[in-house]
A protein has these predicted regions:
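Positively charged n-region of N-terminal signal peptides that target proteins for export
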Residues: 1-4
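N-terminal signal peptide c-region/cleavage motif recognized by signal peptidases
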Residues: 12-15
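N-terminal capping segments
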Residues: 17-113
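Active-site scaffold segments
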Residues: 57-61, 149-152, 157-160, 173-177
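...with weaker cross-activation on analogous glycine-rich loops/strands in unrelated enzymes
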Residues: 81-167
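Low-complexity, Gly/Ser/Thr/Pro-rich intrinsically disordered linker/tail segments
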Residues: 161-163, 170-207
């Protein structure tokens, strides 16, 4: 009886979790919105509504904003016009909250998650071949004392350095060619670099 109850609970959990995932069409639109929002942080500078500005913070912010309703109020608050925008996504209320309920480990969820926990508990490993990356996927490096995320934008890579000054907002954009020839080899995304762990994709996206 007990085993049957546990199996039922696990089945219900899987059904609920699966129902909150984005389907293929939703995932494609999410990626376009995610990339656009990340691009705006580079073009305009970080939004004042983006708290905890670091590499993982960029992913959290872009994901959360991508899942919102992009009405006129949202456009104004993000400094965007209604021209050249991606199609709007049709999402359930639960799906719109996906980036507010990150798995933080130890059975906890919330709007904040570190880079390592974003990878460990909220993403799936894709591989170490950059050609496998889709726009919005994360490029993950582990330097021992610190972990770092970069975002594949489709044609280039962006990231936040984790620090900012009055003259430097911390946002960076580099081409894949630049990264592959980086003088500091710890940041080269190929399998010969032990610090490069791989390409990761958010769990709620369809593969």
């Amino acid at each position: 009886m007990r085993h049957g109850l546990l199996a039922l609970i696990c089945w219900l959990y899987c059904v609920v979790a699966h129902s909150e995932m984005l389907n293929v069409e939703q995932s494609g639109l999410f990626r376009v919105w995610f990339v656009r929002i990340a691009q705006e942080q580079l073009r305009q500078g970080p939004s004042p509504r983006w708290y905890q500005q670091d590499c993982a913070g960029l992913v959290r912010f872009a994901a959360n904003e991508a899942l919102k309703v992009h009405d006129s109020k949202w456009l104004k608050s993000n400094g965007l016009s209604n021209q050249y925008l991606p199609p709007e996504m049709t999402l359930t209320p639960e799906q719109r909250q996906l980036a507010q309920n990150w798995n933080q480990g130890n059975g906890k969820t919330g709007p904040y998650v570190t880079a390592i926990n974003l990878i460990q508990y909220n993403s799936q490993f894709i591989g170490q071949d950059i050609n496998q990356a889709l726009p919005g996927d994360m490029i993950f490096f582990d330097q021992g004392d610190a972990q770092h995320l970069m975002v594949w934008m489709g044609r280039y890579i962006i990231y936040h350095t984790g620090s900012a000054t009055k003259t430097d907002n911390g946002m960076r954009a580099v081409s894949l060619q630049q990264l592959m020839t980086w003088k500091d080899t710890r940041w080269i995304p190929n399998d010969s670099n032990p610090n490069f762990i791989g390409i990761y994709r958010l769990n709620f996206l369809a593969r």
